[in-house]
Amino acid sequence: MALEQLCAVLKVLLITVLVVEGIAVAQKTQDGQNIGIKHIPATQCGIWVRTSNGGHFASPNYPDSYPPNKECIYILEAAPRQRIELTFDERYYIEPSFECRFDHLEIRDGPFGFSPLIDRYCGMKSPALIRSTGRFMWIKFSSDEELEGLGFRAKYSFIPDPDFTYLGGILNPIPDCQFELSGADGIVRSSQVEQEEKTKPGQAVDCIWTIKATPKAKIYLRFLDYQMEHSNECKRNFVAVYDGSSAIENLKAKFCSTVANDVMLKTGVGVIRMWADEGSRLSRFRMLFTSFVEPPCTSSTFFCHSNMCINNSLVCNGVQNCAYPWDENHCKEKKKAGLFEQITKTHGTIIGITSGIVLVLLIISILVQVKQPRKKVMACKTAFNKTGFQEVFDPPHYELFSLREKEISADLADLSEELDNYQKLRRSSTASRCIHDHHCGSQASSVKQSRTNLSSMELPFRNDFAQPQPMKTFNSTFKKSSYTFKQAHECPEQALEDRVMEEIPCEIYVRGRDDSAQASISIDF
């Protein structure tokens, strides 16, 4: 009895092994027949098969009921100048609700969840044919916690984009254009396409740059230059950034407007894709990539103060590798020192000679400026006298009389002699006053009085002149007696007395000053 039970168990095990082996052989045979078809293993979001011309995908557990509380996202991507057509099998059921608020299928025209909404679907009737306007389509399936259904199965294919039929569509193949970069940092630039002749002039550009960071590092991307020839026309030109691989589900950012922001990747592999059609070949970009690790930083790395640690070799290299310029902020002194050393080595002799010449000229100039004023002062002290000092600082008309010093001395001698004669005449004329009055009468007295008043009034008036006119040949005798000449024939004695009396104010003025006789004579002119 026990032997029979053991045989039965062995038979069951043998049958099970044969069934498993048969399934494995069948699977291998099917894989060999489907060359070029990529199978996505069964996951919580169902099966997704992709080919070069399209593919198909389904809801989880299809054709059985899908599980509750599920959310699956499918992003379809066609080649450039192509669009996507999406169809559903007739076996279709998603929990119906008003405006499909519960279980539903959401489809958008583009690669993002914020792309234009095509529609939301639910119920028992499968959607009609859906066609995208570009090369991307975003699809999301969502279920709530109750009332599950059969689900769906969809097929998609790629068709030529009618907007590019004049360029040949998919009949005009795009050349293969791929580049690879790696290391602590580097530059990704679109000009590399022309330099390496990856495409010919007039052809569209669809190039991919694959970046690999250093071990255990991530990638930071910063645009140094960016310009799209046709801004905001993503069909014609764009730059896309992928994180990890070039699969559409790894799309991190896409730029086709006028601004491109920095991108921080979560993996050590980044993919940059640039697309530009035949009419957008002037589009360009230049991007810096930097490998970084997260803190804490080691001794061989530099802390960027932005959750980044970069290699020490990137510090003060003239390029901003950190998100903020911490790695280049304290490098000014070092750069200036290096520049000074370079100038000293190459032009030290010229700078030294020039500096010496300038220094010598400066010293000579200072000595000349200091020594020249001292010579003038010494000369003045040596030849200084009161008369010369007075002549320099008195008004200019005093210098004119100093030039005629000899003539003035002779005139002063005559004046002194006349004054002496006047004194003698006055003493002798006292006794003969009556005789004098009898001959000249009261008229002479009035004339004398008027002459005396005239000379006394004339003196202060002439003293007010600041600068006398240039004098002619000096003749004091003629000038001082000219106004009495007309009356000399009437009374010679009175005329002589009047002439001498006119000089009395001048004599008083001369005696009242200590300067010289030059000032008294200048008043008469």
Swiss-Prot record:
Posttranslational mods: N-glycosylated.
Signal peptide: 1-22
Chain segments annotated as transmembrane: 348-368
Keyword Transmembrane tagged: yes
InterPro entries in the record: CUB_dom (IPR000859), LDL_receptor-like_sf (IPR036055), LDLR_class-A_CS (IPR023415), LDrepeatLR_classA_rpt (IPR002172), Sperma_CUB_dom_sf (IPR035914)
Glycosylation sites: 311
Subunit structure: Interacts with GRIK2 and GRIK3, but neither with AMPA-nor with NMDA-sensitive glutamate receptors.
Protein name listed in UniProt: Neuropilin and tolloid-like protein 2
Organism: Mus musculus
Upper classification of the organism: Eukaryota, Metazoa, Chordata, Craniata, Vertebrata
Gene that specifies this protein: Neto2
